[in-house]
């Protein structure tokens, strides 16, 4: 009997958008499936994906991922056209799409991709409703992060 492949928590991550948490206030997160072609799945398994400039566009009651780059492998088939920046459809429930549509109609809100990961054998993407940060907000978050690191360092040394 074939044993199911189990991933450790955190090891199933394919790609992360670290810039998103720096440039946006994250309001609410959603999990969505991604419609992929065969060569794209192979490239994801090899880790050849970049979602740092990606965002979600809602059109006619459907959600699409734009700006994600999946680089084709050298051994990709020659009879298929490998377009690395193509628009990919996201699989969400209609209730979730309606919620996203209602939220992004507000001023300053957008939907960005946070991370892409494997869930069992399916490729999933974590998307979030986000509001853009101003420059002083970015500086404040950097100061808070640095203070937290210093505080942890001080507490670690104080306990010795």
Swiss-Prot record:
Belongs to the SmpB family. InterPro entries: SmpB, SsrA-bd_prot, SsrA-bd_prot_CS. One of its GO terms (cellular component) is cytosol. Keywords: Cytoplasm, RNA-binding. Pfam families: SmpB. Required for rescue of stalled ribosomes mediated by trans-translation. Binds to transfer-messenger RNA (tmRNA), required for stable association of tmRNA with ribosomes. tmRNA and SmpB together mimic tRNA shape, replacing the anticodon stem-loop with SmpB. tmRNA is encoded by the ssrA gene; the 2 termini fold to resemble tRNA(Ala) and it encodes a 'tag peptide', a short internal open reading frame. During trans-translation Ala-aminoacylated tmRNA acts like a tRNA, entering the A-site of stalled ribosomes, displacing the stalled mRNA. GO terms for biological process: trans-translation. It is found in: Cytoplasm. The lineage of its organism: Bacteria, Pseudomonadati, Pseudomonadota, Gammaproteobacteria, Enterobacterales. NCBIfam families: PRK05422.1, smpB. This is SsrA-binding protein. It comes from Hamiltonella defensa subsp. Acyrthosiphon pisum (strain 5AT). The gene is smpB. GO terms for molecular function: RNA binding.
